[in-house]
Every structure is written in structure tokens, then in C-alpha cells.
Amino acid sequence: MEPFKRILALDVGDKTIGMAVSDPLGWTAQGLHTIRRETPEADIQAMKIVIKQYEVTHLVVGLPKNMNGTIGPQAEKVRHFIEQLRPEISCEITEWDERLTTKMAERSLIEADLRRSKRKKIIDTAAAVCILQGYLDFLNR
């Protein structure tokens, strides 16, 4: 039996990138952290470090489609980031529809009774967890 390969999910924004990684069995998503975006080179280097550290073989990147399913300006920025990242890593990359994941993450954090200041610090990581858990649930159904 082939061992499970870890999956890394990214919630890519203009200022930050939230990250989550799958457990070794591929059932659950755990939040890692959020990095502050600097330069494309620094962002890619940060991704390479996490990919190596967690032995990631697959990347799932949230694609923020418009509510009608079309690709808007923010999704184009994410695709541009993916195209910059693709030649630098050996992982398969999957785009995953992330509509409403930030809202879902925020609702969960509010229900957990976290103050606004704390929510603001972890919302991107929580959104990455939602993206990855949705993808894992899809794979495991």
C-alpha cells in the first residue's frame, strides 16, 4: 500500500497567504500559519520551505470565483501566482473553487467566540483549512 502524500492548501490574497496541510491519512486539514506577502520570489521561497518541511506532493490553491462562477480580477491574480510557482516546485497543483470559504471560516471563528483582533490574524489560515477540508471530503467520498 502506498503511503499517503500530504496536501498543502493555499488561500492567496493580495497581502497574505493562508496555509493548511492535510494529516498523514488525508482525512483532516490543519491550519499552519499565514505569511505576509513580500515579493514573488520571497513568496515562492516560503512555499518551497513549507513543501519540503511537510513533504507535500500536491498543492490545492483556492480560486476566488465570482458568485456566478466566472473568473474575476482576484482569481486572475491567483492564477498569475500559480503560474509563477509552477516551474519552481515539483508538486501537482489543483485550483479549487473557494467561493464563500472566508465567510465560512469567519462564521466558525465567531462561533468559537474569538475577538475580532484574533480573528483578523487567523482568518486566512482558517480559510485555507476550509479549502483543504472541502477538497479532502471530495477525494474521500
Predicted regions and their residues:
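Phosphate- and other anionic-substrate recognition elements at nucleic-acid/protein interfaces
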Residues: 2-8, 15-141
